[in-house]
Each structure stands twice: as C-alpha cells, then as structure tokens.
UniProtKB/Swiss-Prot annotation:
Residues of this chain annotated as glycosylated in UniProt: N210, N288, N422, N465, N532, N720
Reactions mediated catalytically: Hydrolysis of terminal non-reducing N-acetyl-D-glucosamine residues in N-acetyl-alpha-D-glucosaminides
Any GO molecular function: alpha-N-acetylglucosaminidase activity
UniProt similarity note: Belongs to the glycosyl hydrolase 89 family.
Origin species: Arabidopsis thaliana (Mouse-ear cress)
Protein name: Alpha-N-acetylglucosaminidase
GO BP term, pick one: positive regulation of cell division
EC code: 3.2.1.50
Described purpose of this protein according to its UniProt entry: Involved in the remodeling of the N-acetyl-glucosamine residues of proteoglycan complexes during reproductive development. Is essential to promote the first divisions of the zygote.
Alphabetized InterPro entries for the sequence: Glycoside_hydrolase_SF, Hex-like_dom2, NAGLU, NAGLU_C, NAGLU_N, NAGLU_tim-barrel
Keyword Cytoplasm: no
GO cellular component, one term: plant-type vacuole
Amino acid sequence: MHSIKLVLLVLLIISFHSQTVSKHHPTIDGLLDRLDSLLPTSSVQESAAKGLLQRLLPTHSQSFELRIISKDACGGTSCFVIENYDGPGRIGPEILIKGTTGVEIASGLHWYLKYKCNAHVSWDKTGGIQVASVPQPGHLPRIDSKRIFIRRPVPWNYYQNVVTSSYSYVWWGWERWEREIDWMALQGINLPLAFTGQEAIWQKVFKRFNISKEDLDDYFGGPAFLAWARMGNLHAWGGPLSKNWLDDQLLLQKQILSRMLKFGMTPVLPSFSGNVPSALRKIYPEANITRLDNWNTVDGDSRWCCTYLLNPSDPLFIEIGEAFIKQQTEEYGEITNIYNCDTFNENTPPTSEPEYISSLGAAVYKAMSKGNKNAVWLMQGWLFSSDSKFWKPPQLKALLHSVPFGKMIVLDLYAEVKPIWNKSAQFYGTPYIWCMLHNFGGNIEMYGALDSISSGPVDARVSKNSTMVGVGMCMEGIEQNPVVYELTSEMAFRDEKVDVQKWLKSYARRRYMKENHQIEAAWEILYHTVYNCTDGIADHNTDFIVKLPDWDPSSSVQDDLKQKDSYMISTGPYETKRRVLFQDKTADLPKAHLWYSTKEVIQALKLFLEAGDDLSRSLTYRYDMVDLTRQVLSKLANQVYTEAVTAFVKKDIGSLGQLSEKFLELIKDMDVLLASDDNCLLGTWLESAKKLAKNGDERKQYEWNARTQVTMWYDSNDVNQSKLHDYANKFWSGLLEDYYLPRARLYFNEMLKSLRDKKIFKVEKWRREWIMMSHKWQQSSSEVYPVKAKGDALAISRHLLSKYFP
C-alpha cells in the first residue's frame, strides 16, 4: 500500500511551481495538519461516534468501546482498528474500535457490523438499515486475529455534487439530515460539500454593496432550483425566497456543520464564482460585468434568462469574494480551509489565451485567500470533459497552475466512465480526487459500472506520478442503486481491487439478512448486465414512459424502412430479437439507453421472485424486488413504443391501437407496483415540500417547485416545451398515473387520429395539449397523494411477471 508520504514525495517531484516545500507552497501534508488543527477535541469526536451507535444500535450502546487515536499510531495517516476488548468482568464492552477521527471510528463500526455481523446500512428510501442479524449483547463475534487494521490509502472521501442539494436535499429538515450525516460517517466520508443556507449569507454580503431585498428576489432561484441560480445558469425561476426560508435554512446549515465537525469531517463551503445580481451593474457602472448567454430557456425570457458574471480580473470581484468568505467565518467560525468554486463550469472564457486564463484563475483564488489565508480551491473537473474542445493542454495547465501548489484540488468528476487523470498527466501535478458521478437528475434506473469502480481508484492511485488524494461520489441525486454507493465508499479504504463477484455474494447476504442461492444467482446476472455498463454513455434515464420522445412519427415514412443505419431491439415477451429498421436522419427515432440483455435480466427477476417466500419480510428485499420489476417493465415499454411507431409508419391502425393500449396499460400496472413500496411515492416528495412552508403562499410555492422540477423543470411557452423537460424524471406512483399516463394517451390518440383521418400527424397540436396539461398539473394543489404504500409488493410483482412474460 502506498503511504501518504510517498504520494506527497511524488507530488513534490512533479510540482509545476517548486521542488521544495515552503510556507508559501504547502504540501498536502501541511494542509492536512492545518485541517486537523480545526477539528474538535478527541472527547467531542468520541461522543459523536457514541451518539451514532446509540441511534443505530441502542441495545448495544455498551457493547463497544470507542476511542480516538493519533495518526502516529496509524503510521502517519488515518486509520481504524478493531480489536477484542479485554477488560475486567463479563459485563460491558466486547469490541474496541479505535480511529483517528470520529469518522474513522464510525467507519470501523460499520466495517465490523458488515463483515462480522452481516449487517447492512443503506438510505431509508432504498430499504433502510438491516441490523437484525447483529447478535445480542454479550454474544458479539470475536476478532479472530489480533486485530483488524484498515488504513486509508488516500486522505479524503469526498461526497456530493453541487446540484445534489436541489435534487435530493431541498426539502429536508434536521431529522433527515441527522440520518444522512450518520450514513456519511459510517461510509467514511470526511470531505462533504456543505451548501445549505448560503443565500442568507449572500443577503448579508450584498447588503454591503447596496443590493436590496427586491434586487435579490430577482437573483435567487426558488428552493428546488437554487443550485442553478448559484451557478449563474438562471435567476428568479421558482422564487422569490421568503425570510422564513432564508432564516430556517441558515439555522439548518449551522446544525449540519456542527454535526459534521463533531465527527471530524472537513466541510467544503461555497465561495464567490462571479455570479452577481443584475442591479450591481447600475450601482457599479464601471465594473466589468458581462451578461451570459441563454441557458436552456425556450426563447430567452429575461425574467430568468441570461445572468450576469463579474469578471475575476475586476477589483470588485476580489472585494465581494473576500467579504463572502469572511461572512461565512463570522457565522460558522473557523471550521474549514476548503472552498468550492466553479467559475468556468459551463461558462467558457472569452479567449483561449493561456496567460488570460491563468490571470482569471489567480484572481478567483486571490478572492478566497483574502478571506482566508489558508484557503484551498476545490474545483469540479466537469468542464474538462464537457468542454474538451476548449480545454486543451495549454488551457488546462494555465488554469491548474494559476494558483500556488497545494492550493487547488480537482474533482475528476466522471472518472468511472470518462476519467481525465489519465489524459492530463495527472492534472499536470495538481492533486485530484477520483470521483464517481453515476446519477443524473435523481433519475431512478438500475445502472452502474461496478468493475470500473473497483479498479478505477486503484489504477489511478498506483499509476506513475499519481497525484490522487481521494475517492469521491458526485451523483446529482441520491437514494438509488445502493450497491453502487456502498462499493464506492469502501474503495476509499481499499488499497487493492475488489473481487466484485465475491463481494456481491457478501453484499446480498448482508442486505437480505440471510444466504439465499436464488438471490446470489440473480445478483450474478445483475453484475454482468445492469451493473456492467461499459458503453461510455451518460445514463440519463431515457425510458419512454418517463421521457416520452418529442418526436414526429410523420417524419419517417415507409420508404425509410431500409437496412441501412438500422439497430437492434428486443421485442416484447418473446425473448427473441428482430430487426426494426429506420434510416438515420435529422428526425431519427429516439433510442432509450440499453446496454445489456433484457432476457438475462428477466431471468434475474424470476430468481428474485422465487426467493420471495423466504425474504418477503425484508424491506431491503422488497425495495430491490420492486426496483427490478420496474426496470424490466420499463424496458418492455420502450420496445412496445418502438413497435407502435413502426405500426404508425406502416399505417397499420389495428396494431397501433393494440400497442398503444399495451403501453398505457404498462404505465398503469407500474403505478400499482410502485404504490406497493413506501419509497416509490410522489406523495412523499410533495408532502415534504409542503411541510417546510409556514403559510399558504409558501405552501403553494414550494409545491409548485416540487412538481415542476420532476416534470417540465424549466420555462416553456404555448408551443415549445422546456428544453429540460423530464431531465429529473422519476418512477414514482402518482406521477405515472396522473402525469406520464395522460401525456402518453394524448400522443397515441393523435397518432391514431392521424391514420383514421388520413392526415399528417400534427406534432404541434399534441405539444400544445401536453404543455397545457403539464402547466395545469404543475400549478395544481388539490390532489393529496399517498405517503404510505398499499398492496402486496411480492404478489403484484409475480402477477406482472406472469402477465407480461408468460
């Protein structure tokens, strides 16, 4: 295992700036020492770990002795140690867990519960916690060897994406946040993003620059769209923010930070990226402020389009950036040195001149360092992938080398699919964190690349001249695919690749509380299918039920059915394949993402259901069973849609009628299926939004935000739907029945009418109707959707399997 000292030596050798260490060019060692100095006392961290144990296993609160140890006891880095407790008497602690921070203690506890007690921890919405397998106090499994010693091969385990706060956390109160921070500690996360409540800080800062509340009403986005307002993609959409919201979120942030710190985590706070209210132009007419281009509005509506960016080279940028950092310190205390800033994310500099780019980067960092002399810039590396035509090696080097060595850390955001580290000479000497992106928009889709997750961090760390300093998870939305996140978290403690096949057997046994051969066989299939995506395609869920294609079937005619430019689809329940042919043209038939054999996954579902009588009491089993049934049926619906469009092109009105009814029936059946699990309900999302409201106006606004984000997302007009519609689609009961079903019905009715009347399909008419339907649904507040499941999930899944795959 490579030690941190070796990594640091390599960092020094390849440093662009200097081959010697000085107080002006600190190494990662120096940064870690300074961050350690900000941590609370050992007793505080031990108390936090004991509190977690009490919440997780209240019956075993006296069964474990938890202690903080120094890094020297771990060879100079972070670690946890699990030993048998050999105290006097037979009553009291049985297991001793030691760690360098509260996070390491929690990680050690989790490791022991997983690998000695077959326990399992996942998000509540993915089945929750399974600790029934833990033996009673006095009978805990002993450690066979002298001890279990696990040392971090890299110092950091990073967590969150800048948009997770909107897709997943937006409606959370402290009770839910407490469970999340516990989950984070158990997974070993020690470098989490902490973006909640920053609008209250900005209000105080901008007040010093004569920006009024009314100006900020046009600047802040609504609760469900704050992430994109913060990035300068939009303004005012879904707003304004009430005083209640600002005050409550700031209070919540202080609770979040307090708990993170007690565990020994280092929170990453926001910094100034240059995004400013439009009113600043009038107050500072000489300032170098640029209006940005349209970001995804349908017609450039100035009410929310085209935000303003203060150029980093302007002295006002430094002044505002310094004020923001200092205001956070005043509110929260000296709790971190690491700040996130993504000035250039989806915001290409006006020139590719390396000197200019270097000057911009230096200015961004100067604003941070004026506010905190020890500031370190944490930057998402998404721009190097999404805008690779601009960010060539000269531009990349110019930005990465614009700050002192050791003062920037890059997130290799999409490393499990499109790593940058191996194409950029390890970010030209800049420390980076290997990250898994995995999820977009909080979509619900069984998907992953487990082999890449097992091997990627290890390959990066042991590669020549490695500058890797962490493993991270940067999903846009959480509470899906728990297997992916458990493995990724574990890789922060693994110095070698994991045998995924063996690991999954252990995972299944832990997750369902017992060994079951059908389940093991099912997971073997899932490992090689849904969790083995290697096509390099970003998995935005494009299943046609939740993202009905805005496609004009009249654009394809019978003559287009040629073998040229064709593709394969798997048709219906017949578990065979036939060729459906469409010529590649501008209005080509939409294709949902499919990277595996549907036949094999149907077999995995059969195995899952065979195990149902043995595992039906397990909430984790029920969640996975419902999710797998949904996955199978959604892919079948994609095939049915394709066959329906083919029937339309062939003017086969009889087949079109039958296939369209089958598609609609699938939506209804899937709604019933999803209604049988508490974790798949629209009502939970809507009610959590309304629960935060303090009055009727807020209640209406928050519900509109919640409804809009998961459907139309952004602005539209009478004839043009939002460019981001269905980006955050969800397979939730209630949403299928009341939104996706009527939309699909409108679409197929227009197709049938077109054939009956022998007229061209009027795509504009259908668009107008479904946009009107969507607006009405978004603005509605009369329906109250269930927050509790109904129906027997196992019986429903078995019925649907026999119905569609007899």
